[in-house]
């Protein structure tokens, strides 16, 4: 079957759907994690969002674009820390890519400008306080990414925020 085959569109439409999301894990010099507070759901999040794959965007590009949109910083994502297969109720699964955003300087932190249409506030949170702010699987993803940074290990594969054995 080729892309010019009349049945190709039907074939593609029948394939399983998967969404993609991408975020950056930013820290300060003390190792605290930068979180943002969305106005459209409970809990806190990392700067990031949906990858605009239909527009040809890849996960790394999506993480950079979302960081610029949400906190006003144009920072190239560093290495890939975690990939998480996130099952959902009432939506297709999401493949969530989490990149190292690096350590922000005091000047970069002072330059943060929130996307007011989506975000209420931001704050820096210690690793121990992450479970208080992050709901469910995101907390596991962030902890796993911090472990990768601490150990120097390679990218961690997760399912629903838990390492795959």
Stretches found by the model and what they are:
Residues 1-23:
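Acidic, metal-coordinating catalytic segment for phosphate/diphosphate chemistry
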Residues 38:
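Short loop/turn segments immediately following the C-termini of beta-strands
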Residues 51-76, 84-138, 164:
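Unchanged
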């Amino acid at each position: 079957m080729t892309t010019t085959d009349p049945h190709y569109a039907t074939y593609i439409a029948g394939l399983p759907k998967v969404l993609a999301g991408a975020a950056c894990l930013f820290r300060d010099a003390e190792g605290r994690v930068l979180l943002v507070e969305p106005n459209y759901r409970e809990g806190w999040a990392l700067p990031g969002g949906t990858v605009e794959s239909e527009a040809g965007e890849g996960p790394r590009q999506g993480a950079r674009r979302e960081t610029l949109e949400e906190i006003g910083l144009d920072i190239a994502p560093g290495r890939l820390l975690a990939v998480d297969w996130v099952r959902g109720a009432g939506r297709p699964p999401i493949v969530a890519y989490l990149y190292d955003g690096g350590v922000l300087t005091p000047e970069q932190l002072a330059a943060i400008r929130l996307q007011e249409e989506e975000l209420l506030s931001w704050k820096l949170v210690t690793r121990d306080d992450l479970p208080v702010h992050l709901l469910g699987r995101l907390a596991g993803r962030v902890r796993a990414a911090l472990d990768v940074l601490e150990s120097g290990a390679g990218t961690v594969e997760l399912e629903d925020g838990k390492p795959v054995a």
